[in-house]
A protein has these predicted regions:
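DNA transaction DNA-binding modules
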Residues: 240-243, 261-262, 274-278, 286, ...
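Glycine-rich phosphate-binding P-loop
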Residues: 235-260
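Conserved catalytic/switch belt of AAA+ P-loop NTPases
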Residues: 301-324
């Protein structure tokens, strides 16, 4: 028994030209045909992300800068959600969509009428195109989990270094610079050269405050390569200095230009920050930098704190009422002078500090690479840095990828992997400046001072908010001079004065059980008056 499959003329032409031929008949048939073409990967460069079909294409042109210099796009490719217009464009360029129209030619001189069929190239109506794209289930369409501009480490420990789509990870590798192949087991000489170049030649001239700052920077530098392997979030990288021209932007560009960056201004409000985050995550940039924050800025943002600990960012798509969900698979950096931290940001931050200890740091010498600010912008030099970094990564993998014992809240897998990588290459000091990070949290410092004075005055005796507030009233000593019984350590309200008992009670409720230094606030209840009482505990005290 045999079955014959009819081969049409259009099948033959489609095979010869590489363009599928799609006959457009009824609307229902058109929807089925076009969905089949998408699910059968007959149209190029289509992928699915979070249930939406996206088209991945090259980015043309540069962004003009105020100086007229080109600012290249973060990555040479970018995805966009496929719209009706986008699908029509793809069909026109990569398929032959047609309708068959018939007309009758009247016969002359007694001849019979002639029916003529004619193919008309066309595209479906907007209603059909919208119906095709309405679904969220796309079997057969390759998932796109992200675009990377450098080789990355797959979950199995192999290095993705072939340009294009990688089925093992769902990533599309769009190289920013061409690299020679990196072996799975680099030679010892290669490893030694890479260590010396990165630690001495590239970074040796920076005025690090302590070894921890250089180690933390190298940890941030390697994070994008390790991300698919470690499969975890990365903390906020804060690069701060005592004065301008210390090298902050060179360091941030050293990371961002390697992987593809977008530089952002620091928004003034939480709503503006949320919009900036959503917009930035929609771009094909692996590193997002809040550059040159105003000196002394206190980074205390609930939205940033949420972003750093959520693998998927959810927000309303700009200009619409629809919600967009975007993978938070980026490295976030901030730079500025004498920056401070507040809220939950300190526990989500890796600190890099610079202190040139001179009045005009722009005049200093000693860099092994002259004009380093220009050097890092050259793709050939980015290739050099990336090659050395990858050699160290593969040497670490070849040695079993040993982990360190660091603990860092939600970022512990990242800290253990990066710490192990650095320790393997004898780079000391990673995360050793945690105390300095805590000291940058002004709010935490204020609470520690307040609770410490409370504990010295009342030990762990329960007090009501009204009693605590009354204890802050200014006394007059025997010489008629005002005396502050709290010695300036009491909490202040928004106007800088002492808060009311009611306001103080509300403030205390938000701090129950949270340690500030060695002190912790506890809540109780007066059994007779049925009102809240407060006490301060200390591990070294009662």
């Amino acid at each position: 028994l045999s079955t014959e499959v009819a081969v049409t003329e259009h099948d033959i032409v489609a095979a010869a030209t590489g363009r599928p031929h799609i006959e457009l008949t009824t609307e229902a048939a058109q929807i089925r045909e076009l969905r089949a073409a998408i699910e059968g990967n007959q149209l190029p460069d289509l992928y699915v992300t979070s249930g939406e079909v996206v088209h991945l294409e090259r980015v043309s042109g540069d962004i003009s800068t105020p100086l007229g210099l080109p600012d290249p796009p973060p990555l040479p490719y970018a995805p966009s959600v496929l719209t009706s217009a986008g699908l029509a464009s793809l069909l026109a360029r990569h398929a032959y969509a047609f309708q068959v129209r018939t007309r009758t030619r009247k016969g002359k001189n007694g001849e019979s009428d002639e029916t003529i069929e004619q193919e008309i190239e066309t595209v479906p109506s907007n209603r059909v195109l919208a119906a095709v794209l309405a679904g969220r289930y796309w079997p057969g369409v390759r998932p796109l989990h992200g675009i990377v501009g450098s080789p990355v480490l797959r979950p199995d420990g192999t290095l993705l270094q072939t340009a294009g789509y990688d089925a093992k990870t769902g990533l599309f590798f769009a190289p920013k610079v061409e690299l020679p192949w990196v072996p799975a087991e680099p030679k010892l000489l290669e490893v030694a050269e890479a260590q010396k170049f990165l630690c001495e030649t590239l970074l040796g001239g920076f005025p690090w405050v302590a070894p921890a700052d250089r180690a933390n920077y190298l940890g941030l530098l390697v994070s994008n390569i390790l991300r698919p392997y470690v499969r975890t979030l990365t903390p906020f990288g804060l690069i701060t200095a005592t004065t301008q021209a210390s090298g902050k932007t060179i360091l941030s560009e050293g990371i961002g230009l390697l992987y593809g960056q977008r530089v952002l201004p620091w928004p003034e409000t939480e709503s503006e920050l949320r919009k900036a985050i959503t917009s930035a995550l929609g771009e094909a940039a692996s590193v997002l930098v809040f550059d040159n924050l105003r000196e002394g800025t206190v980074i205390d943002s609930p939205n940033l704190a949420l972003l750093l600990t959520t693998p998927e960012w959810s927000d309303r798509r700009l200009g619409t009422n629809t919600t967009v969900q975007i993978a938070n698979d980026r490295l976030w950096l901030g730079t500025g002078n004498n920056l401070r931290l507040g809220g939950d940001i300190a526990t989500r931050t890796v600190l890099v500090r610079l202190d040139p200890k001179m009045p005009h740091p722009e005049e200093r010498t000693g860099f092994a690479i002259p004009h380093l600010d220009l050097w890092v912008k050259d793709p050939a030099n980015q290739r050099t840095v990336l090659r050395h970094l990858l050699v160290l990564v593969m040497d670490w993998i070849a040695s079993g990828a040993p982990r360190a014992e660091h603990v860092m809240r939600q970022f512990t897998p990242w800290a253990r992997a990066v710490g192990g990588f650095l320790a393997h290459h004898n780079i000391d000091g990673f995360l050793a400046n945690v105390d300095e990070v805590r000291a940058m949290d002004d709010e935490d410092n204020e609470w520690e001072v307040f609770l410490g004075q409370w504990h010295r005055k009342f030990e762990s005796k329960p007090k009501t908010a009204a009693q605590i507030r009354a204890s802050a009233d200014i006394d007059i000593d025997n010489h008629g001079r005002p005396h502050d019984p709290w010695e300036g350590c009491f909490l202040a309200d928004e106007r800088g004065g002492v808060p009311s008992a009611k306001s103080l009670g509300r403030t205390l409720r938000g701090q129950v059980g949270r340690f500030h230094g060695p002190y912790v606030l506890r809540r109780g209840e007066d059994p007779h008056r049925k009102i809240a009482t407060w006490s301060v505990g200390c591990p070294d005290g009662p």
